Amino acid sequence: MKRIVLYGGQFNPIHTAHMIVASEVFHELQPDEFYFLPSFMSPLKKHHDFIDVQHRLTMIQMVIDELGFGDICDDEIKRGGQSYTYDTIKAFKEQHKDSELYFVIGTDQYNQLEKWYQIEYLKEMVTFVVVNRDKNSQNVENGMIAIQIPRVDISSTMIRQRVSKGKSIQVLVPKSVENYIKGEGLYEH
């Protein structure tokens, strides 16, 4: 049975902390396939500084190239509108029937799971992999995996704010992503 990891997020922009999460999960679980799953529009997040989705996909591909593993699953992007993880996973599972699916979330999302659409069914379809984004460690429900990662306080919001104020984002994002953001004039407003 194939082991497939899905790492969802807005990735607006993708940054060094996302890379650390991806790397730690990849090396811990050693999946057959690893997908970054950018959302078109998350139901539980505010949508400020929304940029053309192609920019986000380009920056994710730059990170994949740097990490040396991963692919992009753009199902939610193609669908457009508000994205419910349940719908995405259900469709993905139909395409990958003989696979074991792992879905990566941070502690911020773990603490909101009861708000997720069809969460009980979703828990039957995937094994949640919870990474400690806000805490030094995380206790999780039975049937879930907790992965301890080095704590790095970087957020996409912080990066967008720094760019809009003309501050450096060096090492907060890979050099290729930094150059892309500057070259395209993203988040400068």
Curated annotation (Swiss-Prot):
Top EC class of this enzyme: transferase
InterPro entries for this protein: Cyt_trans-like, NadD/NMNAT, Rossmann-like_a/b/a_fold
GO molecular function: ATP binding; nicotinate-nucleotide adenylyltransferase activity
Pathway the protein contributes to: Cofactor biosynthesis; NAD(+) biosynthesis; deamido-NAD(+) from nicotinate D-ribonucleotide: step 1/1
Keywords: ATP-binding, NAD, Nucleotide-binding, Nucleotidyltransferase, Pyridine nucleotide biosynthesis, Transferase
SUPFAM superfamilies listed in its UniProt record: Nucleotidylyl transferase
A Pfam family that the UniProt record links to this protein: CTP_transf_like
Catalytic reactions of this protein: nicotinate beta-D-ribonucleotide + ATP + H(+) = deamido-NAD(+) + diphosphate
Enzyme Commission designation: 2.7.7.18
GO biological process terms held by the UniProt record: NAD biosynthetic process
Top-rank taxon: Bacteria
PANTHER family attached to this UniProt entry: NICOTINATE-NUCLEOTIDE ADENYLYLTRANSFERASE-RELATED (PTHR39321), PHOSPHOPANTETHEINE ADENYLYLTRANSFERASE (PTHR39321:SF3)
Entry function: Catalyzes the reversible adenylation of nicotinate mononucleotide (NaMN) to nicotinic acid adenine dinucleotide (NaAD).
Family, as annotated: Belongs to the NadD family.
Name of this protein: Probable nicotinate-nucleotide adenylyltransferase
Organism of this sequence: Staphylococcus aureus (strain MRSA252)
